[in-house]
Amino acid sequence: LNTEIPRRTGCPIPPISRRNTDALRYFMANGGRFAVATGRALPAFRMFAEQVPMNAPAVVCNGGALYDFKTERYLETMELPETIRGQGQDVLDRFPTAAVEAYHMDNVIHAVRPNEYTRQHEHVTHAGVQPVPTLLEVPMPLIKIMFEDDHEHLLALRDYVSRQPWSADYEVFFSDRTLLEVTRKGASKGAMVAR
């Protein structure tokens, strides 16, 4: 059994009721396997994971990775290619109000031009970001990047990205009106659960 943890603007993940926790423990004690699939990055989900009884690896970063909290290691990742940094920086250069968060595998979130949406996202996820001057300075490997701006600006940004020949290498989608995510082609929660 796998459940999704949806993202709700401005809302942290609510606590799990004792009734649900007891039901999950019963399910697992009787041979069931349970895990979570979330769009949240590992640093943003880690503290919540301690509240969720799981006996199977969790999907994080909208399907960009499969993580085993028992062994504290990634079992599978769909890393972005190194070219994403230059491509993403080109997008930032064309859209001056946009910020981008870059999710490194080592529990670090870097942010280029953090804006009000970056700060709101930090508040909701309780995961801090490390500001960097450009996306080119963010170390690899990356699991996902996420552009943050007003919805209207992100629509134009998404349209620009979709016209680039390299866009075929990625999944580009809104996880919220002010958040446009980029993961490797084929990365999704469902696809990672199926693995």
Predicted regions and their residues:
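Asp-based phosphoryl-transfer active-site loop
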Residues: 1-12
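A short local structural element in Rossmann-fold oxidoreductases
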Residues: 6, 46, 158
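Positively charged, low-complexity intrinsically disordered regions
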Residues: 8-9, 86, 185
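Residue-level signal for pocket-adjacent positions within structured domains
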Residues: 11, 61, 70, 75, ...
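Glycine- and other small-residue-rich loops at beta-strand/loop junctions that grip anionic moieties
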Residues: 13, 37, 77, 182-185
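Charged helix-capping and loop-helix junction motifs
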Residues: 16-19, 187
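Active-site phosphate-binding/coordination module
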Residues: 18-118
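Conserved acidic, metal-coordinating active-site core of Asp-based
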Residues: 97-195
